[in-house]
Amino acid sequence: MLQVREPSEHDIVTLMAELGRRGRAAARPLAVASTERKNAALLAMAEALEANTGRILAANKTDMEKGEAAGLSAAILDRLKLDEKRVRAIAEGIRAIADLDDPVGTVIAEWDRPNGLHIERVRTPLGVIGVIYESRPNVTADAGALCLKAGNAVILRGGSDSAASSAAIHSCLVEGLRKAGLPEDAIQRVPVTDREAVGEMLRGLGGNLDVIVPRGGRSLVERVQNEARVPVFAHLEGICHLYVDRSAKLDMAVALALNAKMRRTGVCGAAETLLVDRAVAGTHLVPILEALAAAGCEIRGGEDVRARFPSAISASEEDWRTEYLDAIISVKLVDGVFEAIEHIGTYSSHHTEAIVAEDPVAVQRFLNEIDSAILLHNASTQFADGGEFGMGAEIGIATGKMHARGPVGVEQLTSFKYRVHGSGQTRP
């Protein structure tokens, strides 16, 4: 019987180094590829995805069966699952990226110096991007398409949970590159699930990776942030808050709380903590919690919350620091917008926060004083998404302050350089 040998550590080092070299080689022609050629590749990818829907769903069925047998949580299985509607949405997302303006070559600013020099700041690709993700096969397409549009090569390392689905999707992306005459190595997929492959990416593949973007749970993101020797665009977790001010309209507060928590509980933009102004606890708190409970949400709160809503479970200090990714919400009464800001400043992961209010002073204070990547007024936290921002799609959400913050779309996947035009000037 043929024995299948797991790759050795030496094999993985060699494999990953080769992926890095090929990615760098592909990045050079990609950086100067025309918008028309990149868009042709994207449209061909979308067509290939739709034409191969049956093959993609068969691969996804294999992943789902393995995931169920392994006891994966409902939230992870939801992220992993594909159906015809989701595959169609992935294809439409790629078409939307093709419709976006090409950021490469855009003159961000220009000015003239007294000595006659004309200076331009121009957008350029980052180079080679590494994307490390878990049970999200759609990231294969989103990341590949976004990086291509921004003129970057990308190396994709999906989790073992989504290996078959990601491989099927990746083959469609390569088909699109081939049809458009672009290097097939512009979008590479790590073909092994050994974790040492991640380690090699974090070490930078011999200087051939320029940025790493992790998409996954806390343990993955922590490892990337702690070990990476190249810049990282990431958020550790999404502890998102919804604050209901004393000036909030009740019907709006109920609708936004319900959507922010329950539309999809497993996404990073789902609200995990509800803060309610104590001044409207008598009118707003119970209707909001009744709506959440009726939708199947578990309520956790302090004694003042439980006194008004006895079915609530007692909240601990740990609840304020927890990203549930489930139908659970922690609830706290606060003394106005100042205490809401203080609570968020203490417990937030700096991802997304929202205020429901009609008072412009409270709104401005909330938006100005909270240091999170995304702040919303009278809108659900679940709008924390690059597609909803008009970016076509996103490669992730970044909560850091260097280079990229918030949804990471095509513009955030570029850097810039200076072009200086002279007429023979020499420096005195």
From Swiss-Prot:
Gene3D superfamilies, A to Z: Aldehyde Dehydrogenase, Chain A, domain 1 (3.40.605.10), Aldehyde Dehydrogenase, Chain A, domain 2 (3.40.309.10)
Lineage: Bacteria, Pseudomonadati, Pseudomonadota, Alphaproteobacteria, Hyphomicrobiales
Pfam families: Aldedh
Pathway(s) annotated for this protein in UniProt: Amino-acid biosynthesis; L-proline biosynthesis; L-glutamate 5-semialdehyde from L-glutamate: step 2/2
Enzyme class: oxidoreductase
One GO location term (cellular component): cytoplasm
Function comment: Catalyzes the NADPH-dependent reduction of L-glutamate 5-phosphate into L-glutamate 5-semialdehyde and phosphate. The product spontaneously undergoes cyclization to form 1-pyrroline-5-carboxylate.
GO molecular function annotations of the record: glutamate-5-semialdehyde dehydrogenase activity; NADP binding
Disulphide connectivity of cysteines: none
The reaction(s) this protein catalyses: L-glutamate 5-semialdehyde + phosphate + NADP(+) = L-glutamyl 5-phosphate + NADPH + H(+)
Enzyme Commission (EC) number: 1.2.1.41
Presence of keyword Electron transport: no
Family: Belongs to the gamma-glutamyl phosphate reductase family.
InterPro entries: Ald_DH/histidinol_DH (IPR016161), Ald_DH_C (IPR016163), Ald_DH_N (IPR016162), Aldehyde_DH_dom (IPR015590), G-glutamylP_reductase_CS (IPR020593), Glu-5-SA_DH (IPR012134), GPR_dom (IPR000965)
BP term (GO), one: L-proline biosynthetic process
Record's protein name: Gamma-glutamyl phosphate reductase
Coiled coil: none
Organism: Chelativorans sp. (strain BNC1)
Keywords per UniProt: Amino-acid biosynthesis, Cytoplasm, NADP, Oxidoreductase, Proline biosynthesis
Main location: cytoplasm
Location(s) in or outside the cell: Cytoplasm
